[in-house]
């Protein structure tokens, strides 16, 4: 479905919303995957960060990328590079985990799936986690990574992230429009972004939402740890409440079975009204950040193919 939204006198902006259905076989694969999720998390005890990294690391590392650790100028993380990258192009990837979990190392496999498809190198950043570090530590780290990429000579950079990292990606893009560093961002791609830490979306509290991975109470706890004394309506925490004018082209992907469904839909609507080119893809029956499950779901592979094509088009100026 293509909607033309009028922004002002003489101006129009196209917003594309695509609903992707799934087959009966894919629905069964999703059901089996949810059973495996339940078994994994029921067996978890001890340090949650180690278990989360184990869970994320199940996304397979592709064979045609190179890995390199980064620890320089306040920037820590990993390079995930294709064998033949184009000069000057890069992805800044910000991982999920509710701002309390996750690491660049654990996300290398997932990011390799994007890099291999798009042919664009990605810097996967380790940013400070809560509750040890609160807002604005994560946005500051993301902007430091952007500055580092610019200093390394990259002049075509997209920002990509999932879940909390998706929200952080949108925060980072808005900050870079407000205070530019180098060339303007090329594009943004976010998977199941957490855009509203004030929890005003209907799907967040909807008891009929069958999200197998994240619950309302869990996200509330993550938000408390991350916000510290900050207002949840602060755009540095919740990009939904920020100034969205001037953002680069955006691709937003989300599943129907998500607490964060309305976080994605409302952000897409507001960005479109602000004059941003937005592609929103909603996937039937899919759980939170289903793209990670590329080894199990055809829908995950199709979503990553779409994201890679979006990035290539943005970098090629199409």
Which residue stretches match the model-derived regions?
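A glycine/proline-hinged amphipathic helix-loop "lid/cap" segment
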Residues: 1-83, 316-318
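Alpha/beta-hydrolase superfamily serine-hydrolase fold, recognizing
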Residues: 39, 62, 66-318
């Amino acid at each position: 479905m293509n909607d033309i939204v009028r922004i002002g006198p003489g101006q129009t902006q196209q917003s594309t919303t695509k609903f992707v259905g799934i087959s009966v076989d894919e629905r069964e694969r999703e059901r089996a995957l949810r059973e495996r999720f339940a078994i994994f998390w029921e067996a978890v005890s001890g340090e949650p960060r180690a278990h989360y990294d184990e869970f994320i690391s199940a996304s397979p590392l592709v064979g045609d990328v190179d890995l390199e650790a980064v620890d320089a100028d306040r920037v820590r993380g990993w390079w995930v590079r294709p064998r033949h990258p184009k000069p000057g192009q890069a992805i800044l990837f910000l991982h999920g985990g509710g701002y309390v979990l996750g690491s660049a190392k654990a996300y290398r496999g997932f990011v390799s799936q994007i890099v291999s498809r798009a042919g664009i190198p990605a810097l996967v950043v380790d940013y400070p986690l809560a509750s040890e570090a609160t807002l604005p530590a994560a946005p500051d780290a993301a902007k430091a990574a952007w500055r580092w990429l610019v200093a390394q000579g990259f002049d075509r950079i997209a920002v990509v992230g999932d879940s909390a990292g998706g929200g952080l990606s949108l925060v980072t893009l808005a900050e870079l429009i407000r205070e530019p560093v180098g060339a303007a961002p090329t594009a943004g791609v976010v998977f199941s972004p957490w855009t509203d830490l004030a929890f005003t979306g209907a799907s967040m509290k909807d008891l009929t939402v069958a999200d197998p991975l994240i619950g309302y109470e869990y996200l509330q706890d993550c938000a408390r740890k991350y916000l510290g004394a900050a207002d949840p309506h602060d755009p540095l925490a919740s990009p939904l409440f920020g100034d969205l004018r001037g953002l680069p082209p955006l691709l937003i992907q989300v599943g129907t079975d998500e607490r964060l469904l309305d976080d994605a839909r409302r952000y897409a609507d507001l960005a479109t009204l602000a004059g941003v080119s937005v592609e929103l893809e909603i996937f039937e029956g899919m759980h939170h950040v289903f793209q990670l499950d590329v080894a199990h779901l055809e829908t995950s592979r199709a979503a990553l193919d779409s994201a890679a094509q979006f990035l290539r088009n943005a970098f090629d100026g199409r």
